[in-house]
């Protein structure tokens, strides 16, 4: 696609998954990062700006470094006074001696990784922040800090995000990149509007265009039916015309020329007919049915754990954990990064997946833990090998905006959002009445978010989840538990 944007003192948000957003951001930062796999025909006019880039994933080589080694790579780090470093540490809620720690970068929690990388950009005194999914894998406290950093930044912030709350509270301009017409055409929109106004205006324009397109098609149907009646009448008269009535035949032939001219005019009119609007957002399948409902009095799980320890068994994360879920309750566990939420959810999943009185399905935070990456989505979802079953699966995948080509490619080649859709479809097809979800919305675009939340809110069974998505917590969950060293505490009901 072609895109041209002038960045002048505005925060921005690039949205919708799988459309080259990260590639575009890398190209803006440093074209050499993407020259091996894309061809870019354009120019970067940077002026005197100093760019700072936060990648979506920390580089593997950086994970091996100690925190001290990571900061020491910046020459300007050695020019900073202890007071200046103390101010930077304070902004991020870190201790003054954090810069000199021998802890490896890879051992930091998700929130600590984001903070550390941002602190390095602050030390570098950059003027422009380029942030690729900065809200991934961070807790709510760090999200609040990130919002403050973006809002307090005096110059340009260009960020990619799926977090609707973060976007609503920070962005004052939107760059929307999408692929339409079965992903054969790229389209981008630049709107100098806050996110919520952009969504409302987009929906309003969509509805107006849709109504015009429907009106055009109704008028076309009436016109075409009338045209067919005239055409059939003239053709019938010509067939019944005898050689003894040449004047009548001539009149009918003249009429036929007129009818043909009408046809050509109609074809030109049809070329200018209002097109049905297209949006990239996927249409999601329904989760559960009447058999997924769980009686209010039924105990789904009563789980007790004296000690929750890290997977390597070296550290106690929490003690005295107790969780009781009844009926079709939908609960969410929150907590600081590294508190042990995913570890606890895995243990709960192990118990529920082995039960015979319920049908549980699990969506891990790392999809590769469950997906077979070497098979196609159709093969992964097909449990019978029946031709009708495979046709049904393809129909469902099509409703999720998969192209025929994507349906037959190995899962490892799909985007994170496409992998998540495979797991959601698996849950839909399985007839599950208990869903165990680790960050269920993390790989969906902001425009897909409301659809996902509605789908989970209307699911008739129980939901046990982890999330830092504030809209998901507010709209879907009945109860909110916070995991801390003293166990699970109910903080919202």
Question: Across the structure, where does each feature detected by a protein language model lie?
Answer:
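ABC ATP-binding cassette signature C-motif
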Residues: 5-6, 10-209, 293-493
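Coupling and communication elements adjacent to P-loop NTPase active sites across diverse families
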Residues: 77-104, 111, 201-315
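Short, exposed "boundary/linker" segments that immediately precede the start
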Residues: 1-2
């Amino acid at each position: 696609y072609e895109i041209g944007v002038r960045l002048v003192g505005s925060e921005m948000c690039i949205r919708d998954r799988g459309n080259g957003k990260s590639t575009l951001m890398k190209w803006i930062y440093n074209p050499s990062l993407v020259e091996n796999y894309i061809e870019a025909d354009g120019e970067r006019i940077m002026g005197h700006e100093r760019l700072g880039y936060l990648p979506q994933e920390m580089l593997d080589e950086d994970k091996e470094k100690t925190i001290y080694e990571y900061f020491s790579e910046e020459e300007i780090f050695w020019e900073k006074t202890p007071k200046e470093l103390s101010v930077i540490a304070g902004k991020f809620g870190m201790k003054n001696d954090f810069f000199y720690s021998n802890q490896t970068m890879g051992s930091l929690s998700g929130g600590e990784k984001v903070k550390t990388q941002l602190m390095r950009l602050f030390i570098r005194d950059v003027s422009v922040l380029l942030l690729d999914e900065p809200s991934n894998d961070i807790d709510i406290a760090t999200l609040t800090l990130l919002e403050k950093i973006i809002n307090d930044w005096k110059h340009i912030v260009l960020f990619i995000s799926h977090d609707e709350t973060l976007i609503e509270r920070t962005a004052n301009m939107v760059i929307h990149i999408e692929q339409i017409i079965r992903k054969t055409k790229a389209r981008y929109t630049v709107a100098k509007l806050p996110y919520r106004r952009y969504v409302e205006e987009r929906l309003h324009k969509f509805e107006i265009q849709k109504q015009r397109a429907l009106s055009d098609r109704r008028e076309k149907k009436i016109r075409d039916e009338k045209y067919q009646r005239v055409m059939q009448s003239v053709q019938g008269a010509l067939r019944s015309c005898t050689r003894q009535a040449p004047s009548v035949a001539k009149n009918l032939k003249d009429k036929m020329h007129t009818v043909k001219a009408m046809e050509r005019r109609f074809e030109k009119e049809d070329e200018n007919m209002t097109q049905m609007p297209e949006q990239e957002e996927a249409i999601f399948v329904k989760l559960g049915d009447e058999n997924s409902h769980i009686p209010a009095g039924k105990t789904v799980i009563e789980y007790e754990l004296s000690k929750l320890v890290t997977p390597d068994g070296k550290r106690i994360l929490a003690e005295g954990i107790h969780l009781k879920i009844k009926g079709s309750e939908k609960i969410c566990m929150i907590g600081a990064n590294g508190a042990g939420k995913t570890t606890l959810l895995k243990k709960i999943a192990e118990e529920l997946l082995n039960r015979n009185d319920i049908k549980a399905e699990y969506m891990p935070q790392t999809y590769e833990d469950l997906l077979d990456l070497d098979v196609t989505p159709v093969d992964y979802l097909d449990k019978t090998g029946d031709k009708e079953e495979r046709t049904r699966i393809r129909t469902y995948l099509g409703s999720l905006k998969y192209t025929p080509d994507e349906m037959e490619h190995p899962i490892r080649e799909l985007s994170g959002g496409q992998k998540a859709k495979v797991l959601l479809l698996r849950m839909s097809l399985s007839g599950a009445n208990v869903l165990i979800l680790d960050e269920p919305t993390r790989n969906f675009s902001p425009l897909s978010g409301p659809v996902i939340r509605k789908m989970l809110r209307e699911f008739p069974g129980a939901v046990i989840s982890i999330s830092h998505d504030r809209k998901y917590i507010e709209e879907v969950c009945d109860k909110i538990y916070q995991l801390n060293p003293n166990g699970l505490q109910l903080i919202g009901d």
